[in-house]
Amino acid sequence: RGERLVLREGDVRGQSCELSELRECTVLVLDWSAQVTIDDCHDCQVLIGPVDGSLFARNSSKLRVTAACRQLRLRDCADCTLSLFAHSAAIEACDRIVFGAWNGAYAGLSAHFAAAKLEPGGRNRYDRVHDFNADDDAKAAAPRAPRWSLQPEGAWALWEVADAGAAV
């Protein structure tokens, strides 16, 4: 609870990374990975370097996440704000999710994008979110508020990690 957790370059090395049962933490994953799972995390700020595969977040709330990944999947999450570079994004059983464009920066990031086979100048589809519950909502007797929204472009300041020990 309330910790600052930092995984530096070489700590993950393209392997999977799991964040679970965190409360009021700041997490910096300053490396590239194959897959990232966030389970049962609440009131956290998370910066995740490029992910070659999927970023999964489940049973979490009040997260502020900056991440670059091939695919994002959220399930049973609420009140989360994500700044993304993603080829695809999908949510299921989520509420009040806000998406914005990638805003992260740290030393070595370009090499991590290359290692994860992501092109930062390429297609960022953070704004094309598939909601698995949209059909159910459309069939409901009463109209339902959208489960997700987009943050205006440029609304987020750059989250730049000046060194592995401190975020600016």
Language model regions located:
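Intrinsically disordered, low-complexity terminal regions
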Residues: 1-9, 83-168
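Extended, compositionally simple hydrophobic/Ser/Thr-rich segments
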Residues: 2-111
